[in-house]
Structure formats: structure tokens, C-alpha cells
């Protein structure tokens, strides 16, 4: 299970994403990568979702595709890890990115 600091960092990154502060999200997630091995399955899904959607918003399609594919895999392993709205956006974005390749 992730430590409280990792959970706090993930919540902070989520709040920054909601505020469209994408560069700040990337900074938080870069720090959170140090705790990556300790993240739980649902936290991994959220981590990769935020990483992928942030990369997408910052016009980094290769990184977005990679991270969203990892998020989709994590969400299949932990079905309740992402909200239905997040899953719908994840799969729409994956399709869009794949179509542009």
C-alpha cells in the first residue's frame, strides 16, 4: 500500500489537473514516480490516467498513448479504479491517438 505522502501527492496532482495546471501536474507526477513501486492497483490506474491525460493536454501524443495504455491495463486489473467518466474519456482519447498514428 502506498504511503500517506504518495496518496497526498496523487490527490494534489488530481486537483491541479482539474484546474488545468498541466505543467504542475507533470512536476507532481515526476516526484510521485519515486514511490511508483509502492502504489496500489487503483493508485497506479489513477497515476497513469493523470500522466496520460496531462501529456495529451500538453500535446505529447507518444507519452499520452503510452501512459493511457498503462492506465487502461491497470483499470482492467482494478475495475473500480477509475470513474466511468474517466474510463470513457480514456478510451476516446486512446482511439483518437491511435487514429493519428
Model features per residue range: what roles?
Residues 24-26, 64:
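Solenoid-repeat scaffolds in large eukaryotic assemblies
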Residues 2-24, 33-36:
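Bacterial Sec signal peptide processing site at the extreme N-terminus
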Residues 53-65, 89-101:
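Alpha-helical linker/edge segments of TPR/alpha-solenoid repeat scaffolds
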Residues 7, 46, 82-86:
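Residue register of alpha-helical TPR repeats
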Residues 35-36, 74-75, 82:
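Alpha-helical junction/boundary sensor with strong preference for TPR arrays
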Amino acid at each position: 500500500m502506498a504511503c500517506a505522502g504518495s496518496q497526498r501527492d496523487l490527490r494534489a496532482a488530481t486537483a491541479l489537473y482539474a484546474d488545468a495546471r498541466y505543467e504542475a501536474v507533470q512536476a507532481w507526477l515526476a516526484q510521485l514516480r519515486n514511490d511508483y513501486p509502492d502504489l496500489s492497483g487503483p493508485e497506479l490506474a489513477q497515476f497513469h490516467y493523470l500522466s496520460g491525460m496531462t501529456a495529451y493536454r500538453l500535446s505529447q501524443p507518444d507519452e499520452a498513448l503510452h501512459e493511457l495504455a498503462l492506465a487502461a491495463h491497470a483499470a482492467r486489473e482494478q475495475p473500480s479504479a477509475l470513474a466511468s467518466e474517466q474510463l470513457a474519456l480514456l478510451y476516446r482519447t486512446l482511439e483518437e491517438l491511435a487514429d493519428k498514428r
